[in-house]
Amino acid sequence: MSEWLFDLGNSRFKYAPLHGNRAGQVQAWAHGAEAMDAAALAALPSGRIAYVASVAAPALTQRMIACLQERFTQVRIVRTTAECAGIRIAYADPSRFGVDRFLALLGARGDAPVLVAGVGTALTIDVLGADGLHHGGRIAASPTTMREALHARAVQLPASGGDYVELAIDTDDALTSGCDGAAVALIERSLQHAQRSLGVPVRLLVHGGGAPPLLPLLPDATFRAALVLDGLATWATAASSP
């Protein structure tokens, strides 16, 4: 494959070949805040063009770019723009709109009107109208980050473990139920507002490594594991057009 897509998140790294205007088979692994496993870097593919999106720490981003520059003829870095492929971002300063959110909207454009919820280190929510207009969104801590923050302030509260129940009778379940429930409630409230505001039914798309535990609580949601990479494929196609 001569063209590849790379998505470097806050805690996970994904890449896939570019197949037409979609991402091919995705490979992914976790990484540290400032470093990535040397063996993983050595296993990266090579080719003609690497399309790269990153919200990771600058040092890790620069290391990844340098590594890809040794393997690819061109390395193209994605930046959020006010408009792309029929999508118009609501932010007055598009550079402050995260590139992961930008690409997720590009990946979801065929499903609009849609609410896109990304569950990773953060919980991000964005609403996209059928005309391609972004209607804004929200950012909150994801359930995983909520648990880690509670554990950091109160070490007796475990950072993981437990099951979701409506009214828990032990601490582990209470933590899972509270944190997952808070995320689901924010998504549901945002979806209700979007439907009132737009006056039409709004689809719900979720993505991100932290999304699967929330899916049983969001029965109308569609999970798109490769949504950001699909958006990156759309961006790459648009960038290559004359």
Curated annotation (Swiss-Prot):
Residues annotated to bind ATP:
D7, L8, G9, N10, S11, R12, F13, K14, T121
Q: Domain of life, per the record?
A: Bacteria
- Keywords for the protein's UniProt record, in alphabetical order: ATP-binding, Coenzyme A biosynthesis, Cytoplasm, Kinase, Nucleotide-binding, Potassium, Transferase
Which EC class does it fall in? transferase
Coarse class of the primary localization is cytoplasm
Instruction: Fetch the SUPFAM superfamilies from UniProt.
Output: Actin-like ATPase domain (SSF53067)
Name the source organism.
Xanthomonas axonopodis pv. citri (strain 306)
Q: Which gene encodes it?
A: coaX
Entries under Pfam families matching the protein: Pan_kinase
- What does the Swiss-Prot or TrEMBL cofactor note state? A monovalent cation. Ammonium or potassium.
Report the EC number(s), separated by commas if there are several: 2.7.1.33
List the InterPro entries hit by this protein, alphabetically: ATPase_NBD, Type_III_PanK
Family membership: Belongs to the type III pantothenate kinase family.
UniProt GO MF annotations: ATP binding; pantothenate kinase activity
The record places the active site at D100
The residues that hold substrate are Y91, G98, V99, D100, R101, T171
Q: In which pathway does it act?
A: Cofactor biosynthesis; coenzyme A biosynthesis; CoA from (R)-pantothenate: step 1/5
Cited CDD domains: ASKHA_NBD_PanK-III (cd24015)
Role summary:
Catalyzes the phosphorylation of pantothenate (Pan), the first step in CoA biosynthesis.
Cofactor(s) needed by this chain: NH4(+); K(+)
| Name recorded for this polypeptide | Type III pantothenate kinase
Subunit record text: Homodimer.
Q: Give the location in the cell.
A: Cytoplasm
Q: Which reaction does it catalyse?
A: (R)-pantothenate + ATP = (R)-4'-phosphopantothenate + ADP + H(+)
Listed under GO biological process in this entry are: coenzyme A biosynthetic process
